[in-house]
Amino acid sequence: MADHSTVNGSEIPVYNLKCIDLANPDVHQSAAVLKQACMESGIFYVINHGLSEELMNEFFGQMKKFFALPMDEKKKLFWNQSLRGYRPPAQAVIDNKTQQKDFGEAYHIGVDVAKDDPNCGKFFYGPNIWPPADILPGWKETMMRYQEETINVGRAIGRIIALALDLNVDFFDQPEILGNKTASYSNMFHYGVPGTDFSKEIVGAPPHCDLNFITLLATDEIWGLQICREKNAQPQLWEAIPPVKGAFIVNVGDMLEMLSNGAFRSILHRVVFGKERYSTGLFLCPSHDYVIECLPTCKSEDNPPKYPTIKTGDYILSRFRQLAADTVKDNKAV
């Protein structure tokens, strides 16, 4: 923690993340740094990841072109039950105390799954929804290339995680985890749609932990991401994460916390913004059939498993059901 960040006149501490360099030939050193980061906070930077600056710029440029389309055009691509497509702003109340609606919009894509695939229609499985090529030429190709290359970065990080957990380096390369059966998906976010009042603090995403394995976040260098390292503490202490040009911000999700028996902590985070902001997250997620259970290197007689064994698909469904129940409960309390 080095200094403070000002968000609409409010100062909060800045938390300086540890950094993993994927070009570092000493992978065991990287594993040691990653292990410390995941045990202390559950979030870190990744640099020299192999994605070119040209691709990153092209991706963000195409994303901005989509969100700049007329609302009527965007709503033609409304998201479906597989969580593919466009999510307009004001879909939910994200702050029950103030009744603030969602001032962000999003677009969701994932690994393409054919309509006749048995998994099609489940969360994060299904054919993608694409804008017409005559409206956004090259959009689909850019998005798929970015997603594919980012998934490969995630696999490289997964190998370092494996070493940090005393597993074989290719443990997470299994088809059902991060291999060719992965249920990974990408979300593109635009915070601060027309009509947003930037004179006050705006919650773009309420406090939450990601449900997946790990998340790779890239931003347009506008501040907004905040973390709470002690997620069960009251009151919560929020710290700002500085955006770093060309770097991914990687955070631990609930599934990795469960696999590691709580050694690696999923991080509670939120987005608070004071100006227009674009970001994208690649959410690495095992297949629905993968069984989440404590890894053999993370348990012992003195440290038995802390979490119940559960299939990925069942866990995802339980999280969405809980989210829906909490929303109903909070709305009744207002």
UniProtKB/Swiss-Prot annotation:
Keywords annotated in UniProt: Dioxygenase, Iron, Metal-binding, Oxidoreductase
Boundaries of every Fe2OG dioxygenase domain copy: 181-286
Gene Ontology BP annotations: biosynthetic process
An example Gene Ontology molecular-function term: dioxygenase activity
Entry's cofactor comment: Binds 1 Fe(2+) ion per subunit.
InterPro entries, A to Z: DIOX_N, IPNS-like_FE2OG_OXY, IPNS-like_sf, Oxoglu/Fe-dep_dioxygenase_dom
Tissue-level expression: Expressed in maturing fruits and in juice vesicles.
Pathway involvement of the protein, from the record: Secondary metabolite biosynthesis; terpenoid biosynthesis
Protein family (similarity comment): Belongs to the iron/ascorbate-dependent oxidoreductase family.
Official protein name in the record: Kihadalactone A synthase LFS
Organism: Citrus sinensis
Lineage: Eukaryota, Viridiplantae, Streptophyta, Embryophyta, Tracheophyta
